[in-house]
UniProtKB/Swiss-Prot annotation:
Feature: compositional bias, Polar residues: 1-12
Region annotation Disordered: where it falls in the sequence: 1-24, 186-205
UniProt-listed HAMAP family: RimP
GO biological process: ribosomal small subunit assembly; translation
Keyword Cytoplasm attached: yes
Protein name per UniProt: Ribosome maturation factor RimP
Keywords, alphabetical: Cytoplasm, Ribosome biogenesis
Amino acid sequence: MSNAEAQASSDHTAPGKADTAPAHNPEADRLRALLEPSVLANRLYLEDVVINVAGSHRVVHVVVDLPQEETGGVSLDVIADISKVLSDALDNDPGADTRPYDLEVSSPGVGRPLTEPRHWHRAKGRIATVKVIQGENVTGRIQSVDDGGVTLVPEIAVKKGMKPKQGDPVKLPFDRIRTGKVEIEFSHLSEDGLEPEHNGPSEEA
């Protein structure tokens, strides 16, 4: 299996309670507290829990990632394994309502905004565009990350068809960073046109 953004889903009917609200609500927080120990026990990080409701049906979307000190992406095999673990946890959830649900488990993928220090750690070695609060925006390769901020080696554009030049390293404190986004490097794409560690196929179970 390739390392990739991956997804697995399974359909269930859960035992018994009341109404579920939309994403980023107390029910999502409750499920996060329920599922996080299982995610951590499998050496993963629980990035997010989102609940979408459509009539009598609900979708529980769980986003998992590798710990910040690891490199690469979450493989489809890992997604499939953690999906089974989380499915069992939801089936045995004493606080669940009676509506059927789909469980979707995925990894963040290359398009995730870099909004937390751990996101920057996970993106080390990648090229990112950083919008700063004051001053010019910076596009460069993430060289290092520490408690204070991010050090990038700027990519300086030259003539079309020529490889960009590297500038002097720039240290950006976290409190100066508005947003960050990893840029796709086409030279790193696999034969199917996908970045092997960050984008990829979906899997349904």
